[in-house]
């Protein structure tokens, strides 16, 4: 019985470690963590370390499909990049990441690739309806 319990525990630990490794290796996760998590949180729940000082507070990013489609669309990418600003509220409160990424990455193509990785990552963490 003790051997069985040890085997079950070892299996559970291995499965948990594999799940964490898979989560860390999701394409775009590193980009999300670098550019988005300070405001939107590591879990994309809107509770990043600076969220409390921002007005309006950053939204959770785990239920975007209703607004941006399934899979997440070009519309979301253009919003993140700053290509499209929301008209109802004037300028976006979010940084214009397209400009930031172009300056940092050195080209429009490299910036676009980073944005698409982030959008694909966000698509992978959407809460199922």
Q: How would you describe each model-predicted region?
A:
Residues 1-4:
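Positively charged n-region of N-terminal signal peptides that target proteins for export
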Residues 27, 31, 71, 75, ...:
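Extracytoplasmic/secreted proteins, especially bacterial periplasmic and envelope-associated proteins
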Residues 106-129:
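A mid-sequence interfacial segment
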Residues 17-21:
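Sec/Tat signal peptide C-region and signal peptidase I cleavage site
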Residues 29, 45-77, 99-107:
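Gly/Gly-Pro-rich "capping" loops immediately C-terminal to redox-active cysteine motifs
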Residues 6-16:
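Bacterial N-terminal signal peptides
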Residues 58-59, 81-113:
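Axial heme c-ligation environment in periplasmic c-type cytochrome domains
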Residues 23-24, 29-56, 67, 82-92, ...:
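Periplasmic/extracellular electron-transfer cofactor-ligation site
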């Amino acid at each position: 019985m003790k051997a069985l319990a040890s085997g079950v525990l070892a299996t559970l630990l291995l499965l948990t470690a594999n799940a964490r490794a898979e989560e860390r290796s999701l394409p775009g996760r590193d980009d999300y963590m670098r550019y988005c998590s300070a405001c939107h949180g590591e879990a994309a729940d809107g509770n990043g370390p600076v969220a409390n000082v921002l007005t309006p507070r950053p939204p959770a990013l785990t239920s975007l499909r209703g607004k941006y489609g399934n899979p997440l669309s070009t519309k979301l990418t253009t919003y993140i990049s700053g290509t499209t600003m929301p008209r109802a509220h004037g300028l976006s409160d979010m940084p214009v990441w397209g400009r930031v990424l172009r300056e940092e990455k050195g080209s429009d193509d490299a910036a676009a690739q980073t944005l698409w990785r982030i959008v694909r990552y966000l698509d992978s963490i959407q809460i199922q309806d």
